């Protein structure tokens, strides 16, 4: 596959008031993102509430996303887990239905060593012939995949990039400097993504894109091209939004914001709960500053 460059939306999983997955709205959101310039549709990751959807729902969300996208842009299918065998099965399904690549998170809770992390991802890449993007988010997984392990995995056929969600720009710089040709470095942190891309990163797996897809697409396009002036202007316009969308655990604020825009219900499944009322005015103000209201 060709490298994915630009804004990759970490798409929410829309749900009806009864908590069931709202597939018609999922299809509408995908069409909207493509029209707004989003470069890739990422489904059933953190923002897509992968921990609280069933395996059957997880697979159906991937299938629907691939079907609705219909080759217009790539689909990055969440297919990670803390069981290597289960992650392999999800990757196999993603390949079967035509996803372009998978996003595979560092195993969580069982806290593998660096060697365990390496063997986990190598096993997935060797078992399933589908491009794999690694996902390092130690704030959620506890285990932190160190740059040395990432660079080691970059040599494994089929491992094509990493979503680096630490927000650590120095770390990102070392990865960009040392990664082999063809290995893509993506930000997983909206607040620092512009810096990562201006320094040579390839794109941003974005929560903010759920509510501001065109602005995020324009920001990524400018930053990847080295247009610091344009990227800086858009970044500062979105800065308050980046901050408020993480005022409570993701995807709580972004689902509230999407509901405010009439895009989908704010429904989530327990243990996620609605956003605290005292944050509503601030998030609405940030949305106005970003030109969304």
Swiss-Prot record:
GO CC terms, sorted: cytosol
Disulphide bridges: none
Keyword Lyase in annotation: yes
Keyword Protein biosynthesis appears in the UniProt entry: no
Pfam family, one: DHDPS
GO MF entry, a single one: 4-hydroxy-tetrahydrodipicolinate synthase activity
Residues marked Part of a proton relay during catalysis (site): 46, 109
Record-linked SMART domains: DHDPS (SM01130)
Active-site residue list: 135 (proton donor/acceptor), 163 (schiff-base intermediate with substrate)
Compartments in which it is found: Cytoplasm
Domain of life from the UniProt record: Bacteria
Ligand binding (pyruvate): 47, 205
Pathway(s) where this gene product acts: Amino-acid biosynthesis; L-lysine biosynthesis via DAP pathway; (S)-tetrahydrodipicolinate from L-aspartate: step 3/4
Catalytic activity: L-aspartate 4-semialdehyde + pyruvate = (2S,4S)-4-hydroxy-2,3,4,5-tetrahydrodipicolinate + H2O + H(+)
EC annotation from Swiss-Prot or TrEMBL: 4.3.3.7
Key words of the record: Amino-acid biosynthesis, Cytoplasm, Diaminopimelate biosynthesis, Lyase, Lysine biosynthesis, Schiff base
Family: Belongs to the DapA family.
Job description of the protein: Catalyzes the condensation of (S)-aspartate-beta-semialdehyde [(S)-ASA] and pyruvate to 4-hydroxy-tetrahydrodipicolinate (HTPA).
Protein name per UniProt: 4-hydroxy-tetrahydrodipicolinate synthase
Record organism: Leptothrix cholodnii (strain ATCC 51168 / LMG 8142 / SP-6) (Leptothrix discophora (strain SP-6))
């Amino acid at each position: 596959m060709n490298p994915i460059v630009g804004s990759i939306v970490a798409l929410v999983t829309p749900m009806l008031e009864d908590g069931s997955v709202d597939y018609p709205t999922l299809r509408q959101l995908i069409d909207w993102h493509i029209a707004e310039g989003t470069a890739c549709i990422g489904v059933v990751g953190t923002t897509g509430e992968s921990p609280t959807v069933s395996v059957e729902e997880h697979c159906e969300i991937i299938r629907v996303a691939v079907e609705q996208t219909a080759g217009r842009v790539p689909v990055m299918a969440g297919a990670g887990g803390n069981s290597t065998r289960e992650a392999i099965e999800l990757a196999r399904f993603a390949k079967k239905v035509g996803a372009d690549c998978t996003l595979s998170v560092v195993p969580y809770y069982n806290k593998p060593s660096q060697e365990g992390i390496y063997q986990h991802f190598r096993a997935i890449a060797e078992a399933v012939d589908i491009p794999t993007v690694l996902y390092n988010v130690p704030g959620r997984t506890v285990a932190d995949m160190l740059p040395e392990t990432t660079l080691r995995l970059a040599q494994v056929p089929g491992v094509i990039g990493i979503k680096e969600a630490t927000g650590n720009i120095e770390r990102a710089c070392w990865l960009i400097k040392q990664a082999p040709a063809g290995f893509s470095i993506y930000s997983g942190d909206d607040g620092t993504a512009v810096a990562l891309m201006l320094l040579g990163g390839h794109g941003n797996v974005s929560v903010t894109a759920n509510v501001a897809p065109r602005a995020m697409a324009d920001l990524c396009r400018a930053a990847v091209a080295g247009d610091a002036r344009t990227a800086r202007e858009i970044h500062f316009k979105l800065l308050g939004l980046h901050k408020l969308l993480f005022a409570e655990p993701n995807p709580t604020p972004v689902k509230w914001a999407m509901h405010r825009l009439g895009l989908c219900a704010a429904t989530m499944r327990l243990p996620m709960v609605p956003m605290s009322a005292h944050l509503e005015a601030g998030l609405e103000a940030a949305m106005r500053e970003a030109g969304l209201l």
